[in-house]
Amino acid sequence: MSLLKEFKEFAVKGNVLDLAVAVVIGAAFGKIVSSLVADVIMPIIGLIFGNTDFASSWAYKGIKYGVFIQSIVDFLIVAGAIFLFIKLINKITRKSEVEEVEEAVEENTVLLTEIRDLLRSK
């Protein structure tokens, strides 16, 4: 098998395409969360502490712990959103898996009943 053909099969697999879409959406979502934290949440926190520019004003001798705190808030929001999204997806997929199993069990029961009836008739 040629290298190009192998790469084509690899790149067209569903998992690779799903990963590519996830990376693009994740990058866009990261920008939204960064804006939410920088433009909405941190100014509110800054007002509580008496300053509206929390990230740049909270520094000590070049150590910008305000920016670090802002990054932690970014991370917590992203992690929470991803957790809720994955939880929702798992709930949806579990329901469909249960339905598939129930359908398979019903189909197997029908087939076994037919086989039993055929064996009885012999």
Curated annotation (Swiss-Prot):
TM regions (residue ranges): 29-49, 66-86
Alphabetized Gene3D superfamilies for the sequence: Large-conductance mechanosensitive channel, MscL, domain 1
GO cellular component, alphabetical, reads: plasma membrane
Q: Which InterPro entries match?
A: Mechanosensitive_channel_CS, MS_channel, MSC/AndL, MscL_channel
Q: What is its main location?
A: membrane
Please provide, alphabetically and separated by semicolons, the GO molecular function terms listed in this UniProt record.
mechanosensitive monoatomic ion channel activity
- In Pfam terms, one family for this protein is MscL
Against PROSITE patterns, the record matches this protein to: MSCL
Q: Which NCBIfam families match?
A: mscL (TIGR00220), PRK13954.1 (NF010559)
Q: Which PANTHER family match?
A: LARGE-CONDUCTANCE MECHANOSENSITIVE CHANNEL (PTHR30266:SF2), MECHANOSENSITIVE CHANNEL MSCL (PTHR30266)
- Annotated function: Channel that opens in response to stretch forces in the membrane lipid bilayer. May participate in the regulation of osmotic pressure changes within the cell.
Q: Which family does it belong to?
A: Belongs to the MscL family.
| HAMAP family for this protein | MscL
Protein name stated in the entry: Large-conductance mechanosensitive channel
Native organism is Macrococcus caseolyticus (strain JCSC5402)
